[in-house]
Every structure is written in C-alpha cells, then in structure tokens.
C-alpha cells in the first residue's frame, strides 16, 4: 500500500519509526489516515522490535478531521469511533513496545493515539487536551477509558468537561507522559530509550507488556497468577539461559528472541 499521510523508517536493529506526515492539516485523523495507520500496524515487518510514533511539523496529531465529521449522522459516528478505537487497540496490543514521541499538539484523537502507546515522551512544546465538548461531542477513540486509567477519574473529568489544553509540564505532573525534554532533544532521547529497550531480551519485554496490559481487566489474584505463569515461561527460553550465563560471566548478552 502506498501511503499518502505516513512516512516510515525501518532500522537495522528492528526499530521502526512511523511519522504522521500531513502537517498542512496538523496531522488530523480522517478515515483515510486511520486506514493507513491500520494497514501499517497490521503489516509491520517480522523483524520489528519496537515502534516509535511521531508527527511531522508542529503537531503530533491535532485531533480528528472536523471537516469530515461535520455531516456525520449517528451511524457514521458509531462506525468512525469504533474503527478509530479498533486501530488504537491494535497499537496497544502489539507484541512489541510502542513509544509516542510527542512533538507538538496532541489533542482529541491525537491525545488518544498517544495514550494507546506504551510510553509517552513529550517535547516541552507539546500540548494535550480532549476538547471534544467544544464541538458538541465526546472523545470517540477510547479516550474516556484510557485517560481515566492514566490520570484518574477526577483529572480526566476536568480535562474533558472543560476542554482545556494542558502543557507538557502539567502532563508530566499528572502522569499523562513519562518524560518531558527540550524539542531538539526529543528524538535523540526517544532513540536512546528505544535502543536500551531493544537491547534486552525481547521475549521478556513482551511478557512484561502482556502482564501490564492484561492486568487492566483482571482481579489482583488473576493478575498475580498471570505474572507467575509468564515468569515461569521465561525459563523455557534460550534468552533466559544466555542472559543469566552472561551475567554470571560478566559478559554482554546477545539475545536471540527465543
């Protein structure tokens, strides 16, 4: 598939960079862009070890495309919301880590896209918000669910009821992002973090992600049992044998993803 609104890079170590590249619209999410993201995520190379998502220009994603939504009826709104949520859930469920490198505005669907990623690193110039109520709607791509999980119901309600934007420092304070860096340091910081992650045992990283993600919907007892089961499965991997041997021999491990 030839992409109109996306650019991508695949590095030798398996790190994949996906850039939303429609800066004239501030990378707004329309149906075509969502289709492209969906196709890209479903067709990641088998060698992919980590995905970085960022935006071109002054926005990460400044929201959904209002010009497309303006004449929706209820059924069209349902279809659009469900598809966006499906795409973002597919990103969340990838068996590799996903980092959002938030270079600018992350509003509405852009904030929702960032929240579907495992880790969020923000430029000091980034701005966040769920301003949908100013347009007569509510978040439609699972924002009410994920924002409440990340920052708590009280703060999520304040953001959604008021429609106000918050800056990167406030996003860091409330737990919406992991780190804030100067704009020129955003990609170097994200690249360094990505390289640290992919240097670790891929199966172990995958199991850690599975535990954390699935714990959302589990009781404490079931979540702890899942951890025990996946912890035990690590001992059937070559990477565990090699990693512990390298530790005891004070050498650097080279993991094989098996």
Predicted regions and their residues:
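Terminal low-complexity tails and localization/encapsulation signals of metabolic enzymes
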Residues: 1-4, 245-258
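CoA-thioester-processing core
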Residues: 87, 91-95, 101, 107-161, ...
């Amino acid at each position: 598939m030839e992409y109109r609104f996306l650019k991508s890079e695949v590095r030798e170590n398996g790190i994949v960079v996906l850039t939303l590249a429609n800066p004239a619209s501030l990378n707004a999410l329309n149906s075509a862009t969502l289709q492209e993201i969906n196709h890209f995520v479903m067709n990641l190379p088998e060698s992919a070890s980590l995905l970085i998502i960022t935006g071109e220009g002054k926005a990460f994603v400044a929201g959904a495309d209002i010009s497309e939504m303006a004449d929706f009826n209820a059924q069209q709104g349902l279809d659009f919301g469900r598809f966006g949520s499906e795409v973002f859930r597919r990103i969340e469920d990838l068996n590799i880590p996903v980092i959002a490198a938030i270079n600018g505005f992350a509003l509405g669907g852009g904030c929702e896209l960032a929240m579907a990623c495992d880790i969020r690193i923000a430029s000091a110039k980034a701005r966040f918000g769920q301003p949908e109520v100013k347009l007569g709607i509510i978040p439609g791509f699972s924002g009410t669910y994920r924002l409440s999980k990340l920052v708590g119901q009280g703060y999520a309600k304040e953001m959604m009821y008021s429609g106000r934007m918050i800056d990167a420092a406030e996003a860091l304070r409330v737990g919406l992002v992991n780190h804030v860096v100067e704009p020129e340091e955003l990609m170097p910081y994200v690249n360094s973090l990505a390289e640290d992650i992919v240097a670790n045992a891929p199966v172990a990283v995958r199991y850690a992600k599975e535990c954390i993600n699935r714990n959302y919907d589990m009781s404490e007892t079931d979540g702890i049992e899942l951890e025990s089961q996946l912890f035990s499965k690590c001992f059937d991997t070559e990477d565990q044998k090699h990693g512990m041997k390298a530790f005891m021999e004070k050498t650097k491990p080279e993991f094989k993803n098996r």
